[in-house]
Amino acid sequence: MAVPKRKTSPSKRGMRRSADALKASTYVEDKNSGELRRPHHIDLKTGMYRGRQVLTPKESA
């Protein structure tokens, strides 16, 4: 059975755990519609990505 050779110091333990925290999602304002969207993601309402039409826009029902 594998066991640690040395005790993990509180500093090392804290540095390892620092990546475990939840981070708030970032949003940017869309240039065309002015709505908030995730960066590097397609705007599903308009179907635009980086100034190009990549999807057909959704119809509002």
UniProtKB/Swiss-Prot annotation:
Composition skew (Basic and acidic residues), residue ranges: 28-41
GO process terms (BP): translation
Superkingdom in the source lineage: Bacteria
GO annotations of cellular component type: large ribosomal subunit
Pfam families, per the entry: Ribosomal_L32p
Record's keyword annotation contains Transcription regulation: no
Entries under InterPro entries matching the protein: Ribosomal_bL32, Ribosomal_bL32_bact, Ribosomal_zn-bd
Ranges where the record places region Disordered: 1-41
Biased composition regions of type Basic residues, renumbered to the chain: 1-16
Molecular functions per Gene Ontology: structural constituent of ribosome
UniProtKB keywords: Ribonucleoprotein, Ribosomal protein
Family as reported in the entry's similarity comment: Belongs to the bacterial ribosomal protein bL32 family.
Protein known as: Large ribosomal subunit protein bL32
Lineage of producing organism: Bacteria, Pseudomonadati, Pseudomonadota, Alphaproteobacteria, Hyphomicrobiales
